[in-house]
């Protein structure tokens, strides 16, 4: 019986010791920081973002012009195909690879 008591006391003592050492480890994190958002770092980040935006502006414009040019090209080809298919010329046919209206007999471009 005394061995059991010793073991229980030892286990209790170890548990209390463990709790005593772990309790001070937890830190208090209830610190509130309020900033206006206008710090030197945020101003520098904003300036860098603006500079990068301006540097890539030319590239964005080129990409947009290219996309618009491709769309215009497809639009003109679509209209030309419609005109070719609705043409009164029975020898006219639409060549999809070259996007042109051609004459079946000569292979030359036909104005629909």
Swiss-Prot record:
**Which segment of the chain is annotated as a signal peptide?**
1-27
Keyword flag Nucleotide-binding = no
Keywords annotated in UniProt: Signal
Locate the coiled-coil region(s) and give their ranges: none
Query: One of this protein's Pfam families, by short name?
Result: DUF1283
The keyword Magnesium is assigned to this record: no
Source organism superkingdom = Bacteria
Report the family membership. Belongs to the UPF0482 family.
HAMAP family according to UniProt: UPF0482
- Indicate what this protein is called per its UniProt record: UPF0482 protein Ent638_1930
Q: Could you tell me which species this protein originates from?
A: Enterobacter sp. (strain 638)
């Amino acid at each position: 019986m005394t061995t059991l008591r010793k073991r229980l006391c030892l286990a209790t003592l170890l548990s209390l010791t463990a709790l005593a050492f772990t309790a001070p480890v937890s830190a208090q994190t209830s610190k509130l920081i309020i900033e206006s958002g206008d710090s030197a770092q945020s101003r520098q980040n904003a300036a860098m973002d603006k500079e990068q935006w301006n540097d890539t502006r030319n590239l964005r414009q080129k990409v947009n012009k290219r996309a618009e040019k491709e769309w215009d090209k497809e639009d003109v080809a679509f209209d030309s195909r419609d005109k070719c298919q609705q043409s009164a010329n029975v020898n006219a046919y639409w060549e999809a690879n070259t996007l042109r209206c051609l004459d079946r007999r000569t292979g030359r471009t036909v104005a629909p």
